[in-house]
Amino acid sequence: MEGWQRAFVLHSRPWSETSLMLDVFTEESGRVRLVAKGARSKRSTLKGALQPFTPLLLRFGGRGEVKTLRSAEAVSLALPLSGITLYSGLYINELLSRVLEYETRFSELFFDYLHCIQSLAGDTGTPEPALRRFELALLGHLGYGVNFTHCAGSGEPVDGTMTYRYREEKGFIASVVIDNKTFTGRQLKALNAREFPDADTLRAAKRFTRMALKPYLGGKPLKSRELFRQFMPKRTVKTHYE
């Protein structure tokens, strides 16, 4: 654990007069809680680097739940997120902080996270496809495997012209009932391919990931979503979060 690890800061808060408490996501150790001693002092060279969306190399150690940051280096400047992409980045940071246990390795998820924020930084349109792909990847790494290609129970291949109802922990079954848990075969095929060519498939992906993530998030609302509603134009909020 004392070696260098690639990492990103998910969240930070003041800890004593001169230190920071960090929630970080690392390549080898997963989510880790760190104390950065002296990081808030005027002479500290760390404060500017220990920011969300800055690719970092960290070295830390300690025996308790809270580790001590030994060294930190910024690999590059922070990825340029602003406006809706900034709130989207804060959302995925909060999502990881809420659903990942401490010190559980998720190396592949680390690169899914990196790819997501890189996509957000280079996005000139909607961030929704990148967010949906990341949510689906996260669910997969958490062990929430869903078969989008075959009907639960019968095992029949999903038909693009039929409708299917989602049942938690089971999958999708053919259904003639249309409600919030119903998806078309076309939508399921888009979810499986992680490709969302139109607004219909994006809305379906959001419906599914919200349902699937709900057990992990519980009843506590996401702070990033509330911040988005407060500070972004109402039309944008409706488009991206409703």
UniProtKB/Swiss-Prot annotation:
What's the protein called, per UniProt? DNA repair protein RecO
HAMAP family reported for this sequence = RecO (MF_00201)
One of the GO BP terms on file: DNA recombination
Which family does the UniProt entry place this protein in?
Belongs to the RecO family.
| Keywords attached to this entry | DNA damage, DNA recombination, DNA repair
Q: Which organism is it from?
A: Shigella flexneri
Q: Which GO terms describe its cellular component?
A: bacterial nucleoid
Task: Cite the record's note on assembly.
Answer: Monomer.
Q: Does the keyword Plastid apply?
A: no
Function field? Involved in DNA repair and RecF pathway recombination.
